[in-house]
């Protein structure tokens, strides 16, 4: 069936519609509202987004905080040029970290970030990741101090389709105003549309719940299998506090701010008897594994052949998704992380 054929999720996007910078002020970003029951499309801006939220809906937000995950170093302490890139993914066992390192690398290699701080390669993993440990003058760093190192020397991990180096504005614009728990290496991008004023109004006027899904680097990976049902999606760390779990269990109508919040809710609500607050989320939502527990979604416009485009199709159908994306391109909506948004009701 064509809805499970990977090629059905391809589309052409003119390069000029890839947003390299955010719209400021945030409220001026464009918003496409699709109402499924009436099949109507409304073109507006984020200044009016809360006017469309159903009054009785529970609004779910992902409060993960993006790490400055890109480090640049050199293979020799005395070299001033830092041309080796280390992309931090997540902590592994104890104080080691899973990373990607550009260029040739072998076990035992050291990458220096300054005269004192360096990383040592411990293992080359089959999936292209490298297991490393961080040191300060030969003293191993714990997780807390590694995060301090990343904050001091790291760069914001802008997505690969943004063809520029990170700038000072990215430190706050590629971070939601309600970001709280550090651990993501990509922003939950629908969240970026909310200013502090808009957030305060949302929290005052709507029932809401926070959860934390630490978005992983796998979020940018294309699906590669010809039949999308055979794709193995990446795993991400999910934390849902008991208070939020209780609110989710009792709520009938749910609106998620972003696909990460939606995937988290769907994963949690399908568990038989959840008795913990932390999980490993690996749910892949598509037309053969449709959305069951979320009614509405605020999201950005996603990459061709991505699992997120398949998630949107699982919510409104493949043909309707393609139709709306075609309209968005014709109307010059801006796509991807710093782009405009879409509200599905």
UniProtKB/Swiss-Prot annotation:
Top enzyme category: transferase
Predominant cellular place of this UniProt entry's protein: cytoplasm
Keywords associated with the record: Cytoplasm, Queuosine biosynthesis, S-adenosyl-L-methionine, Transferase
Pfam families documented for this protein: Queuosine_synth
Family annotation (NCBIfam families): PRK00147.1 (NF001140), queA (TIGR00113)
General function of this protein: Transfers and isomerizes the ribose moiety from AdoMet to the 7-aminomethyl group of 7-deazaguanine (preQ1-tRNA) to give epoxyqueuosine (oQ-tRNA).
Name by which UniProt lists this protein: S-adenosylmethionine:tRNA ribosyltransferase-isomerase
């Amino acid at each position: 069936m064509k809805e499970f054929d990977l090629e059905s999720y391809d589309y052409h996007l003119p390069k000029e519609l890839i947003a390299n910078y955010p719209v400021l002020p945030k409220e001026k970003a464009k918003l496409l509202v699709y109402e499924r029951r009436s099949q109507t499309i409304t073109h507006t801006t984020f200044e009016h987004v809360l006017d469309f939220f159903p009054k009785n809906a529970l609004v779910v937000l992902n409060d993960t905080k993006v790490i400055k995950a890109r480090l640049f170093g050199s293979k020799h302490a005395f070299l001033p040029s830092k041309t080796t890139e280390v992309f931090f993914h997540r902590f592994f066992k104890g104080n080691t970290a899973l990373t990607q390192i550009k260029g040739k690398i072998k076990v035992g290699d050291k990458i220096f970030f300054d005269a004192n701080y360096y990383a040592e390669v411990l293992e080359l993993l089959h999936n292209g990741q490298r297991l490393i440990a961080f040191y300060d003058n030969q003293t191993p760093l714990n997780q807390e101090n590694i995060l301090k190192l990343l904050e001091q020397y790291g760069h914001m991990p802008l997505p690969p389709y943004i063809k520029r180096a990170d700038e000072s504005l990215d430190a706050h614009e590629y971070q939601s105003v309600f970001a709280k728990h550090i651990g993501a290496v990509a922003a939950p991008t629908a969240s970026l549309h909310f200013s502090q004023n808009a957030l305060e109004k949302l929290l005052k006027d709507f029932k809401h719940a926070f959860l934390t899904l630490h978005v992983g680097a796998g979020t940018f990976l294309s699906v590669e299998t010809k039949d999308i049902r055979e794709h193995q999606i990446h795993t991400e760390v999910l934390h849902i506090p008991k208070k939020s779990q209780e609110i989710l269990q009792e709520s009938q109508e749910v609106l998620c701010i972003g696909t990460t919040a939606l995937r988290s809710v769907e994963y949690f609500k399908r568990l038989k008897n959840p008795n913990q607050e932390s999980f490993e989320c690996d749910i892949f939502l598509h037309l053969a594994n449709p959305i069951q527990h979320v009614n509405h979604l605020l999201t950005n416009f996603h990459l061709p052949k991505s699992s997120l485009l398949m998630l949107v199709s699982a919510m409104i159908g493949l043909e309707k998704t393609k139709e709306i994306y075609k309209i968005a391109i014709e109307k010059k909506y801006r796509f991807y992380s710093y782009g405009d948004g879409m509200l599905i009701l």
